[in-house]
Amino acid sequence: MAFDASFFALVGLVLFFVLIAYLKVPGMLSKSLDERAQNIQDELAEAKRLREEAQHLLAEYQRKRKEAEAEAAGIVAAAEREAAALTEEAKQKTEEFVARRTALSEQKIKQAEEDAIGAVRAAAVDIAIAASEKLLAEKTTAAAKAKLFAATIGEVKSKLN
């Protein structure tokens, strides 16, 4: 029987498969592939969990951002209302101050007018008295002066009693 190269190749192949089966390479290969598949499945589950957690955090931060924006808008609106109220109050106080100052100025002007009128009247009375005295001194005699003096003293006594 002649053994050619294909026979030895077949024998080598059979021996190779027997050796692989004896060393349990298919089981080790299957176990290795199963472990690799389990690792990939665990990594996918972890990635899914992390993705859900990230989405939850994103939703929470978006909610907090909206709340912060609403709060900021409320603060701005309150500040605008307060500024408007302060502006209105300052305007009202300024108008009241101007009105008081105007009234005080008008009162001072009126008082100055009254004082001036009083001074003019007093000066007119003084001038009239001086003119009367001069006229009376020039035109009355000593007897008429004594009679006028006595009448005036009597009038003063009657008004004092």
UniProtKB/Swiss-Prot annotation:
InterPro entries: ATP_synth_b/b'su_bac/chlpt, ATP_synthase_B_chain
Chief localisation class: membrane
CDD domains documented for this protein: ATP-synt_Fo_b (cd06503)
Membrane topology listed for this record: Single-pass membrane protein
Localization of this protein: Cell inner membrane
Transmembrane segments: 3-23
GO terms, molecular function: proton-transporting ATP synthase activity, rotational mechanism; proton-transporting ATPase activity, rotational mechanism
Signal peptide: none
Known function: F(1)F(0) ATP synthase produces ATP from ADP in the presence of a proton or sodium gradient. F-type ATPases consist of two structural domains, F(1) containing the extramembraneous catalytic core and F(0) containing the membrane proton channel, linked together by a central stalk and a peripheral stalk. During catalysis, ATP synthesis in the catalytic domain of F(1) is coupled via a rotary mechanism of the central stalk subunits to proton translocation. Component of the F(0) channel, it forms part of the peripheral stalk, linking F(1) to F(0).
PANTHER family reported in the protein's UniProt record: ATP SYNTHASE SUBUNIT B (PTHR33445:SF1), ATP SYNTHASE SUBUNIT B', CHLOROPLASTIC (PTHR33445)
Record text on subunit structure and interactions: F-type ATPases have 2 components, F(1) - the catalytic core - and F(0) - the membrane proton channel. F(1) has five subunits: alpha(3), beta(3), gamma(1), delta(1), epsilon(1). F(0) has three main subunits: a(1), b(2) and c(10-14). The alpha and beta chains form an alternating ring which encloses part of the gamma chain. F(1) is attached to F(0) by a central stalk formed by the gamma and epsilon chains, while a peripheral stalk is formed by the delta and b chains.
HAMAP family: ATP_synth_b_bprime
Family, as annotated: Belongs to the ATPase B chain family.
Protein name, UniProt field: ATP synthase subunit b 1
